Amino acid sequence: MAKEKFERTKPHCNIGTIGHVDHGKTTLTAAITMTLAKSGGATAKKYDEIDAAPEEKARGITINTAHVEYETANRHYAHVDCPGHADYVKNMITGAAQMDGAILVVSAADGPMPQTREHILLARQVGVPALVVFMNKVDMVDDEELLELVEMEVRELLSSYQFPGDDIPITKGSALAAVEGRDPQIGEEKILELMASVDAYIPQPERPVDMPFLMPVEDVFSISGRGTVVTGRVERGIVKVGEEVEIVGIRPVQKTTCTGVEMFRKLLDQGQAGDNVGVLLRGTKREDVERGQVLCKPGSITPHTKFVAEAYILTKEEGGRHTPFFTNYRPQFYFRTTDVTGIIKLREGVEMIMPGDNAELDVELITPIAMEEKLRFAIREGGRTVGAGVVAKIVE
């Protein structure tokens, strides 16, 4: 059977559900698919189908990330049901990176809880651009004033983590009512209202091809009589023959010119996001470029050594360390295509970091790397991964 062609008629956006355990993230995800299925915008998925991650059945905790897709009149969405449990913060640090926006689910009966706060903080740290709120289980609260109090509390919490708490749309409803097909005024109608706010409030992400050119260097060759060729996969933007590019990271920034782009042994006049290409550089010597640097549009990215990271440290069971680490720990940081040694300083009042913890770390690399906020990395010791992280803030 031929594969269905993916109709790319609508703009695409990646979103997810976040929030405290048992506040209704997975039920809401099911409710969205069921509601949109009525207009042909989704395949209805039951709670059990979304929650079907093998580890999770024993403890009722979603561990693995479930993926569903659906569309509204305006956009096509890929939706991840993010794990709510504190242990699974790692999905946010490593994977929920794929979120252009998120739906924060808060139970009206409980109000914000510790993981609500933690997920908002993580969304801020890992750079989720926008949040909308679904206040769930409103049928469990009789008092209108209580609902208003919870709403105020949620808005204040969002503001305290630098999200625009006053402006964020909050939809109040019951995901379960929508799933069970009852009380449309708090069920189905509210799901449609929520999706309208997601459509309107979560900005359309810029397409990789429209961003400034960047290509991590994987390999370097010299071709006699032609010069130096660097190969890699273009991460974003477009590089055209004749354009100036910069080589950033590890050593002082160098400027050069792209004199040729080659893909599958064919010469092209440009390479764009997603292409595996060889880029010919004018007047650059083989020894001037190395793996771990990036080619980029001049001025679009700068080299840095000091940054604040949000990191998750793997447990022993996940193949990580068996023991905690302390301040001045010196692992390797794997950025894009290379390892760089860095020194970790723990925050004041933090004695040590245990396997399974997530924490804010101050890092100083021994050589500069082309860096920007939201850049992901692995923490490694002797080639094995012991942690995952994201650049939350560049210091210098």
Swiss-Prot record:
Residues in the signal sequence: none
Annotated region described as G2, given as residue ranges: 60-64
Region (G4): 136-139
CDD domains attached to this UniProt entry: EF_Tu, EFTU_II, EFTU_III
Region (G3): 81-84
Family: Belongs to the TRAFAC class translation factor GTPase superfamily. Classic translation factor GTPase family. EF-Tu/EF-1A subfamily.
Gene3D superfamilies xref list: P-loop containing nucleotide triphosphate hydrolases (3.40.50.300), Translation factors (2.40.30.10)
Molecular-function GO terms, alphabetical: GTP binding; GTPase activity; guanosine tetraphosphate binding; translation elongation factor activity
Region G5, residue ranges: 174-176
Domain tr-type G positions: 10-206
Protein name: Elongation factor Tu
Keywords annotated in UniProt: Cytoplasm, Elongation factor, GTP-binding, Hydrolase, Magnesium, Metal-binding, Nucleotide-binding, Protein biosynthesis
One Pfam family hit: GTP_EFTU
Enzyme class name: hydrolase
Subunit comment: Monomer.
Protein purpose: GTP hydrolase that promotes the GTP-dependent binding of aminoacyl-tRNA to the A-site of ribosomes during protein biosynthesis.
